[in-house]
Amino acid sequence: MLQTKNYKFWFCTGSQDLYGDECLAKVAQHSKQIVDELNKTGILPYELVWKPTLITNELIRKTFNEANADEECAGVITWMHTFSPAKSWILGLQEYRKPLMHFHTQFNEEIPYDSIDMDFMNENQSAHGDREYGHIVSRMRIERKVVVGHWSDSVVVGKIASWMRTAVGIMESSHIRVMRVADNMRNVAVTEGDKVEAQIKFGWEVDAYPVNEIAESVAAVSASDTNALVDEYYDKYEILLEGRDPEEFKKHVAVQAQIELGFERFLEEKNYQAIVTHFGDLGALKQLPGLAIQRLMEKGYGFGAEGDWKVAAMVRLMKIMTAGMKDAKGTSMLEDYTYNLVKGKEGILQAHMLEICPTIAEGPISIKCQPLSMGDREDPTRLVFTAKEGHGIATSLIDLGNRFRLIINDVECKKTEKDMPKLPVATAFWTPEPDLYTGAEAWILAGGAHHTAFSYDLTAEQMGDWASAMGIEAVYIDKDTKIRDFKRDLMLGEVFYR
C-alpha cells in the first residue's frame, strides 16, 4: 500500500559559456563525479540523476519544463559550479512547479594553497555563483531548501536525503484521498475543517461514503478468506483470552478480520489511501473497527478517529515520507489522554479506544477482546502493546477559520513507570519538549488538537519544510521554546499568513 512512483531527483549544475569549452568540460566532469559519489553513499533514499550543465536561458527553461513533465522526477537540486548570471534562470524558475533544493557546495574541499591560480579561481566560483543564484530565487519569492557543505560530508548527504523524503511528501500530497465513512463527532470543534481549502492547499481529496456501503463490502468477504486471515493473526500475535471462551473469542477476532479485508478491498476499489470512522456511526458493522484499522495503518493507510480527516491525511503523508526507511521505528495516530504530574516523572499517556498503529510497538503484541462503552456494538478485538522509547515528533494540523496551521512538538517517548494491567489498549508515554508544562501551554496557545500524527522517523525540520512548500504556517515547540517568544511568533503568524 505504500508503493509510490519510482522517484528520482535531477542534479542541475549552473555555469555560462564565458569560460570556454575546457572549463565547461571540467564543470561537467566534476558534477558527474559528485552525483556518482552521492549515489554510492547508500544514504540517499532516491536516485540522483545528472543533467548536462545549464549555461543558457533556453536550456534552463527547457530542463525545468522537462522536470515538470517527468512523472518520476520528484525535484531538482541546483548548484552553481561557476558564476551563472541569474537572469538566465528567471523563466525556468517561473515555470517550474516541483520541489527545489539549492545545494551550496563546491567540488574541492580545501583551498589548494600551493597551486591555486586564476584559472582555478575562474573554474571554482560557487562561493559567489551560488549567491547570485540565491538572490534571484529569493527575489522571486520561490520556496526552496538550502543545504550548505561539502558533498563528501556524510552529515550534508544526510540533509539531502532528509529533504528528498520531504520532497516526495510534497509530490505525493496531491495524491492523498481520504474516505469518510462517518462524519465529525457531534459538537467537536478541532476535528472540523475546510475540505475545499485543504484540496486547494494540499491537494487532498476528502469524500464521504455511507457507512453501510463499506459495510456491504465487509459482508461480502468470504468465510474462507476471513478464516485464513484469522489464522495469520493467531500465528503472528499473542492471544490473551483473559477468561473468555476460546471459540467465542475467535468469533470476535473473525469480525475484525472480515472488516480488515472488506475495508481494504473497498479502499483499493475506490482508490483511497486513508479512512476515518466514528464510534457513533457504525451502521451494519458488528464492531467498532479496531484490530482491522491497526492492521491497515501498518500497511500504510492513514487513519483518523471520530471523523478526523486531517489526522488521517497527515498519517498517510508521514507514512509515505518514511517509506523504505532502514530501521524505521514507526508512525501512528495518537491521542493525548491523561497526565502524570508527579514531579520529575511528568508526561502524557497516549492511547486511543482501539486504533494505534503497531509499527510503533516494542515487545510483544497481543490480541485482546474487551467491552467498549462507545459504539453500542459487540466487544471489539484490538492489538495491545506499548510503544518504543526514543525521540519523535507529534504534529497537529488545525483549521483557524481563515487558514491552516501546522503545530510540531518534539517529544521524548519513555517507558511508563508501572504496568497498567487493566488498560486494554495500546499506549505510548511521552514528555513534550522543553518540559511538560511549557510544552502543554504552548500547544494549547497554538490551538493544537488532542489527536496527533506522530512519528519516530521524521524531524520537525522535515515537516516544517513540507508546511512551507504548502504555503502554511508551521510553529515549533522544542527544547528552545519560551512562552513569551512563542506568543510573539503566533502574533507574527497572524499578520503574515492571511
For the regions a protein language model found, what residue spans apply to each?
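Short beta-strand segments enriched in small/hydrophobic residues
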Residues: Q3-K26, H175-N184
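Short catalytic helix/loop segments, enriched in acidic residues and glycine
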Residues: A25-T41
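Cap/lid and interdomain-hinge subdomains that line or gate substrate/regulatory clefts
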Residues: P45-E47, H104, E109-R244
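Short, well-structured alpha-helical segments in soluble
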Residues: I60-C73, I90-G92, E260-E269
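Periplasmic-binding protein-like
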Residues: C73-F83, M101-F103, Y272-T277
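Long, internal scaffold/assembly segments composed of regular secondary structure
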Residues: E232, K236-G324
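C-terminal catalytic subdomain
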Residues: G300-V425
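Extended hydrophobic packing segments that form well-structured cores
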Residues: D376-R498
